[in-house]
Swiss-Prot record:
Lineage: Eukaryota, Metazoa, Chordata, Craniata, Vertebrata
Residues covered by the bHLH domain: 48-103
Membrane-spanning segments: none
Sequence motif YRPW motif, location on chain: 327-330
SMART domains: HLH, ORANGE
Name the record gives this protein: Hairy/enhancer-of-split related with YRPW motif protein 2
Annotated GO MF terms: cis-regulatory region sequence-specific DNA binding; DNA-binding transcription factor activity; DNA-binding transcription factor activity, RNA polymerase II-specific; DNA-binding transcription repressor activity, RNA polymerase II-specific; histone deacetylase binding; identical protein binding; protein dimerization activity; RNA polymerase II cis-regulatory region sequence-specific DNA binding
Length: 337
C-alpha cells in the first residue's frame, strides 16, 4: 500500500509517494521507511521546491511591474502625472481603463494615429516646461505669484500652449478630412500668401503677384524656387510697415501665431508627401522639412518678437545693462504682448 507524503504542495508535478510496506511485514521494514522519510535527500528536495517557488513568485512580480511601467509610459494621462508623484498600481490601472474607454468612445481612432499621439505628447511636454518655468521663477528668481512679470510670462506661455493645441487640432482635422493626393502640394501653397497677408490689411491686388500657380501653369521643376520666393515675400510683408499708417503693421499674436503655425505645418506635410510622389530634386532650392522641424519653426516664430517690439525694447535693455541687472530678454518681450 502507498500513502502520500504529508509534505505536499500545490504543484502537481512535485507530488511524491513513499512506499511504507505492507501491514503484515515485520516492524523492521516500517522503521526503515520512517528513516527514509526523514532522510537528508527528502529534506533537500523540500528546500529545492521552496526555492523554486520563490523564484517563480519573483518572476511573476517582475512581469507585473514591467507591464505596469509600460502602461504608465503608454497612457498619456499617467505619463503626465509620473513626474509629480509616484503613481500606485491601482491608479495606473484606472487610468488605463479610462484611456481604453476613451478609445472605444472615439471609435478606436484616437491615439492609434501617430500624428495625434505625437501632438498630444508635445502638448504635455510644453505644459511640463510651463510648470518648471513657474517653479524656477518662484524658487530661484524669488518672484511670487502676484509679481507682474511672472504673471505676464506665465500668461504668455499659457496662451502659446493653447494656440499650439488649437493649431494642432485644426491641422489634424484637415489631415483626416483632406488626404493628400499627388498634386496636393501646389494646392496647399496656393493660398499661403493671402492667409499670411490678410491680417496686415493689404488689398487683394497687392497680394496677387506673389500667388502660386497650379501645376498646370508652372512646371514642377520650378516649384521649389517659387515656394522659397513665396516664403520670403510673406516674411518681408509681415515685417514691413504699411505706408499709410505707422500703427499695427504686425498682426496680434493670437492670430499670427495660429495661422503661421498651421500653414507651416501643412506646408511641411505637403512637401514631404511631394517628395514621395514626384521624382524631383529639392536639394538646391527648398529643403525638406520633417514634421518636428515644422514644430520647431512655429516655436521659434512664437518666441521671436516683431520688429517694432525689438526696436522699442532695445533702449530698455541698454539701460538695464548700465544698472548691472541680470539680462532678461523675455521680460520686455512679454510686456509688449
Amino acid at each position: 500500500m502507498k500513502r502520500p507524503c504529508e509534505e505536499t504542495t500545490s504543484e502537481s508535478d512535485m507530488d511524491e509517494t513513499i512506499d511504507v510496506g505492507s501491514e503484515n511485514n515485520y516492524s523492521g521494514q516500517s522503521t526503515s521507511s520512517v528513516i527514509r522519510l526523514n532522510s537528508p535527500t527528502t529534506t533537500s528536495q523540500i528546500m529545492a521546491r521552496k526555492k523554486r517557488r520563490g523564484i517563480i513568485e519573483k518572476r511573476r512580480r517582475d512581469r507585473i511591474n514591467n507591464s505596469l511601467s509600460e502602461l504608465r509610459r503608454l497612457v498619456p494621462t499617467a505619463f503626465e502625472k509620473q513626474g509629480s508623484a509616484k503613481l500606485e498600481k491601482a491608479e495606473i490601472l484606472q487610468m488605463t481603463v479610462d484611456h481604453l474607454k476613451m478609445l472605444q468612445a472615439t471609435g478606436g481612432k484616437g491615439y492609434f494615429d501617430a500624428h495625434a499621439l505625437a501632438m498630444d505628447f508635445m502638448s504635455i511636454g510644453f505644459r511640463e516646461c510651463l510648470t518648471e518655468v513657474a517653479r524656477y521663477l518662484s524658487s530661484v528668481e524669488g518672484l511670487d505669484s502676484s509679481d507682474p512679470l511672472r504673471v505676464r510670462l506665465v500668461s504668455h506661455l499659457s496662451t502659446c500652449a493653447t494656440q499650439r493645441e488649437a493649431a494642432a487640432m485644426t491641422s489634424s482635422m484637415a489631415h483626416h478630412h483632406h488626404p493628400l493626393h499627388p498634386h496636393h502640394w501646389a494646392a496647399a501653397f496656393h493660398h499661403l500668401p493671402a492667409a499670411l497677408l490678410q491680417p496686415n490689411g493689404l488689398h487683394a491686388s497687392e497680394s496677387t503677384p506673389c500667388r502660386l500657380s497650379t501645376t498646370s501653369e508652372v512646371p514642377p521643376a520650378h516649384g521649389s524656387a517659387l515656394l522659397t520666393a513665396t516664403f520670403a515675400h510673406a516674411d518681408s510683408a509681415l515685417r514691413m510697415p504699411s505706408t499709410g499708417s505707422v500703427a499695427p503693421c504686425v498682426p496680434p499674436l493670437s492670430t499670427s501665431l495660429l495661422s503661421l503655425s498651421a500653414t507651416v505645418h501643412a506646408a511641411a506635410a505637403a512637401a514631404t508627401a511631394a517628395a514621395h510622389s514626384f521624382p524631383l530634386s529639392f536639394a538646391g532650392a527648398f529643403p525638406m522639412l520633417p514634421p518636428n522641424a515644422a514644430a520647431a519653426v512655429a516655436a521659434a516664430t512664437a518666441i521671436s518678437p516683431p520688429l517694432s517690439v525689438s526696436a522699442t525694447s532695445s533702449p530698455q535693455q541698454t539701460s538695464s545693462g548700465t544698472n548691472n541687472k541680470p539680462y532678461r530678454p523675455w521680460g520686455t518681450e512679454v510686456g509688449a504682448f
